[in-house]
């Protein structure tokens, strides 16, 4: 027995159903969530982007800033062992705060830059390749594979895009993918 058409879930538009390579699938789904994050910001005013949402305590723009730090921490410092600042120096909550002198454009540009760098690193390595030593990971026994790191990013985005979906509904009633 099948569900009536109005009860069938929408078909995801990406990745296409004929993509079966695990590396490509993972990267395409991760990009889908990155794009969903940005879609959920569409139509919000600057005050809505900056204001903490209800009981959540963070702003939509703060979430974007946090995910930029997550990309940097896991891909550049974690996987590539680049000598980069992995956490803001102020305190644990600093990566969620957007000061008044930091523009929406600045936050989005920094986020896009980290995503671009992550994509380049992920495209140039095999899923089984271990993280390089010297950044986040000091010993081979600690170093996860690129695949494991990408799955971590995937779950981070899935969780936070879901949070943003709730935040958006609280802000203006908008729901959906």
What annotation goes with each model-predicted range?
Residues 95-133, 148-154:
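Acidic/histidine-rich alpha-helical segments that form the ligand environment
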Residues 2-16, 23-41, 46-94, 134-177:
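Short, contiguous alpha-helical
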Residues 20-26, 104-108:
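Active-site rim elements
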